[in-house]
Amino acid sequence: MRRIFVGDIHGCREPLERLIGELRFEVGHDELYPVGDLVAKGPDSLGVLSLLADLHANPVIGNHDLAWLRADRIESKSLARWLRQSPVVREFEDLIVVHAGIHPQWSDRRLAQLAASDIAFATNVRYCDEHGVRPHSDWPVPDPPFLPWDKFYRLRRRVVFGHWARRGFDRSDRVIALDSGCVYGGALTAWIAEEDRVVQVPAMAPPRS
């Protein structure tokens, strides 16, 4: 079984279909884990949800997903129910999956019992200080003591996340950042954990020769 993690899709069904093809994804053999923000901004949010549901994907919830659910913007009630079941954090023995980031003061036990007040941090953070206080704005880049949240991350498991298109794809011993700005004309990125391999497709399909 391969665990395949996918960056922010934002309603871009066509690049998602190409990525699935590049991955040679097989339902029942592979497992797909989108890192949230499946909807909004792109041209076919409903199509993205439908495709992911058909593939039995296991997303975490993103800030735009939450906004659409709260505003009742998803026309299909069954797809809305499917999306609403997505957790804020998904845990594996070796990995933590979250849309935006992990608070510096959260423990492994806290991750298993997140409060409603924790959801905003997990789905929105980019910068914070060592206490988890966020700046008023993430742009322009805030001055110290505010740093990228993972500078203060101390748990042992690697974190897979999205949310941060300006940061783009980034990989270190502690994190895998997967939002490569597909909806802005960048790329859609997947990371295959068992192979430690990255697969990307451009936002726009290359012209046919």
Where are these regions (language model features)?
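Active-site-proximal loop/helix segment associated with metal-binding centers of metalloenzymes
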Residues: 81-87, 92-152
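Catalytic-core regions built around general acid/base machinery
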Residues: 48-55, 78, 82-85, 149
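Core catalytic region of metal-dependent phosphoesterases/phosphodiesterases
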Residues: 2, 6, 11-74
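Beta-strand-turn-beta hairpins that frame and shape the catalytic cleft
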Residues: 1-4, 90-96, 172
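Divalent metal-coordination and catalytic microenvironments
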Residues: 8, 37, 52, 62-63, ...
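Short hydrophobic-aromatic micro-motifs
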Residues: 5, 59-60, 95-102, 159-161, ...
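Active-site environment of divalent metal-dependent phosphoester hydrolases
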Residues: 10-14, 40-43, 66-69, 90, ...
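Conserved beta-sheet core of the metallophosphoesterase superfamily
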Residues: 106, 112, 146-204
